[in-house]
Amino acid sequence: MDPGRVVFDSGVARRACPGGAQMLLFGGGGSANSGGFFRGVPAAVLGMDESRSSSSAAGAGAKRPFFTTHEELLEEEYYDEQAPEKKRRLTAEQVQMLERSFEEENKLEPERKTELARRLGMAPRQVAVWFQNRRARWKTKQLEHDFDRLKAAYDALAADHHALLSDNDRLRAQVISLTEKLQDKETSPSSATITTAAQEVDQPDEHTEAASTTGFATVDGALAAPPPGHQQPPHKDDLVSSGGTNDDGDGGGAAVVVFDVTEGANDRLSCESAYFADAAEAYERDCAGHYALSSEEEDGGAVSDEGCSFDLPDAAAAAAAMFGAAGVVHHDAADDEEAQLGSWTAWFWS
């Protein structure tokens, strides 16, 4: 037997045989894992179970060597006891009690921590850790709540701002509209005045229109109506009389010239009457006396071509002369009718 293949180990013998008997280990053709020195020795006898050795050496991070001292074994057992335990889950009753305690006071005092741990059957350190995590979550939720509140306030302010802008635009439009209406109202009287003046300019004068539309003589011998404001002379029947006098009874008054056409009414121009106010005023100033129309038998009377006789004072004679100078003359010929009418009209307007 090869002495290099015989090993005596009391430690291995004690672990293999709890009774404390010593064992001789004979080498042989063991596995390659046992090394060249322990070839042929079963792994179970040597106490080299891979599962056990790997679990015991997991904390050290490397496989424990075969030869170890007593101090190393004690240190290994100490570290196995200090291995972290599995995380425990809290029950629903514990969570509810912790939540109520946190709502009452989120700060945890030592006396309160001990009392909660005793009531809940938990370690004081576990209670402290739960409160710390709960405060962190509460701060996060508080920030979220503050953000939501500030965002809602911002949205409300933005809506109010947009509403104010809309009201401002509406009021500005109303101001512009009212200003335009006011300007139109201010300019409308002046335009109306201009329009009225233009209409007045376009419309002819009443006297002019009446004079332009009035005929002063007709072929039938009738005189048209005079324009407004013109004093109507008396009719020849009222003036031509044998003993006509004025209101004072002294024979003074306006001189009247009557042209009477008794024959050929269709061929001659007939003048009904003519009233000379200027001659009357001159006569009243001069007090020349009373002159009246007389028949053709009276002495000093002037007899017309048609058989009418009348007396004329000096002023009336002058007016008659002017009337005659204007060309108003009686003719028996029908071809001179138009010339006589034009001459009489020119004298009337002069």
From Swiss-Prot:
Keywords for this protein: Activator, DNA-binding, Homeobox, Nucleus, Transcription, Transcription regulation
Which tissues does it occur in? Expressed in seedlings, roots, leaves, nodes, internodes, flowers and embryo.
GO BP field: positive regulation of DNA-templated transcription
Is Hydrolase found in the keyword set? no
Q: How does it assemble?
A: Homodimer. May form a heterodimer with HOX4.
* Family indicated by similarity: Belongs to the HD-ZIP homeobox family. Class I subfamily.
Q: What is this protein called?
A: Homeobox-leucine zipper protein HOX5
Q: Which gene encodes it?
A: HOX5
